[in-house]
Amino acid sequence: MASGVGAAFEELPHDGTCDECEPDEAPGAEEVCRECGFCYCRRHAEAHRQKFLSHHLAEYVHGSQAWTPPADGEGAGKEEAEVKVEQEREIESEAGEESESEEESESEEESETEEESEDESDEESEEDSEEEMEDEQESEAEEDNQEEGESEAEGETEAESEFDPEIEMEAERVAKRKCPDHGLDLSTYCQEDRQLICVLCPVIGAHQGHQLSTLDEAFEELRSKDSGGLKAAMIELVERLKFKSSDPKVTRDQMKMFIQQEFKKVQKVIADEEQKALHLVDIQEAMATAHVTEILADIQSHMDRLMTQMAQAKEQLDTSNESAEPKAEGDEEGPSGASEEEDT
C-alpha cells in the first residue's frame, strides 16, 4: 500500500489494493485520487469523494503505471490540514452546541422550578384569599340574616297595622256590588237594560218606568232559558257549509266570504251566552250580598233592641237608688233626735 504524498509516491508504488482498508483484508483498488495519490475501493472512494469535494478520482487500471500527484506536495498537505482544521471546528461547534443545549435545558429546568414555586405560592395565596372571602361571606350572611329578621319583624308589625290584601280585595268586590250612582246595594234587576240596579234607580235614577224584577225572579228566568242556541247555531253552520261547498258555481272568494259571515253569526251567539252566564254570576253574587245584608240588618236590629233594654234597665236602677237614699237619711236622724229628748 502507498502512504504519504509527494516523493513518497515515487518510492512506494501502488500494490493494487485499497489504502484505507486493513492490509490483510484490503480488496482490489477501483479508483485513485489525482490530488493525494491514494487508491480506494468503491466504498472508501465514495467516502473520500464526499469528504474532499475538490479532489478528483479516476478509475484505477491494474498493471498500469501508478499515477503520482504533483511535485508540490504542499497543496495536498495544506488541504489535509485544512480538512483537519475544519473537522476540529466542527467538533468544537458540536461541543458548543451541546453545552448551549445543556445550558438551555438547565435554564428551562430552573424556570420550570421557579414557575412551579410561583404557582404554589399563587395557589396558597388564592386559598388564603378564598378562605378570607368565605369568612367575609359568612359574616355578611349572618348580618343579612339579622337584618332580614329585623325587617321581617318590622314587616309583621306594619302588616298588622295595614289592611290585608284579601281584605282589600273583598272591599273592592263589595264596592262593585254597590250602585255607582246612589251607593246602595244592587237589589233589583232591570229587564229592559238587563242590569242590576238599586231601589233608588227606578225612582230618581235612569231606570224610571222600566220593567223590573227581583233578583230571584231574574235568576230563575235566565237559568230557565234554553241554552241550546249555541249548539243549534253550530249544527246549522255545518249544514250550510256542506251545502255551499257542494255547489260547483261557488268560487273560492265567495266561499271565504260565506264562511266569515256564518262565523260572525256563531260569534254573536257565543257572546250572548257569555253575557247570560255573566248575568247569572252577578245575580248570584247580588243575591248573596242581599242575603248577608238582611242577616246583618236583623243582627243590628236585635242589637239595637238589646241596647234599648239595657238603657231602660239602667235608668230604672238609677231611679230606685235615688228613692232609697232619702229613707236611709230619715232613719239615721230619728234615733239621734230621740236620744236628745231623753237627755233634756
From Swiss-Prot:
The species this protein was found in: Homo sapiens
Give me any GO biological process, just one: positive regulation of DNA-templated transcription
Q: So what does this one do? A: May play a role in the process of differentiation and maturation of neuronal cells. May regulate the activity of TRIM17. Is a negative regulator of PAX6 expression.
Tell me the subunit arrangement.
Answer: Interacts (via coiled coil) with TRIM17 (via coiled coil).
Q: Which parts of this chain are annotated as the region Disordered? A: 1-25, 66-165, 309-344
PROSITE patterns attached here?
ZF_BBOX (PS50119)
Q: Where is the composition biased (Basic and acidic residues)?
A: 75-92
Entry protein name:
Tripartite motif-containing protein 44
SMART domains attached to this UniProt entry = BBOX (SM00336)
Matching SUPFAM superfamilies: B-box zinc-binding domain
B box-type zinc finger positions in the chain? 174-215
Q: Which gene encodes it?
A: TRIM44
Coiled-coil region? 290-325
Q: Which disease is it linked to?
A: Aniridia 3: A form of aniridia, a congenital, bilateral, panocular disorder characterized by complete absence of the iris or extreme iris hypoplasia. Aniridia is not just an isolated defect in iris development but it is associated with macular and optic nerve hypoplasia, cataract, corneal changes, nystagmus. Visual acuity is generally low but is unrelated to the degree of iris hypoplasia. Glaucoma is a secondary problem causing additional visual loss over time.
Bias-annotated ranges (Acidic residues): 93-165, 330-344
| Positions of modified residues (Phosphoserine) | S336, S339
GO cellular component terms, alphabetically, are: cytoplasm
Q: Which InterPro entries match?
A: TRIM/RBCC (IPR050143), Znf_B-box (IPR000315)
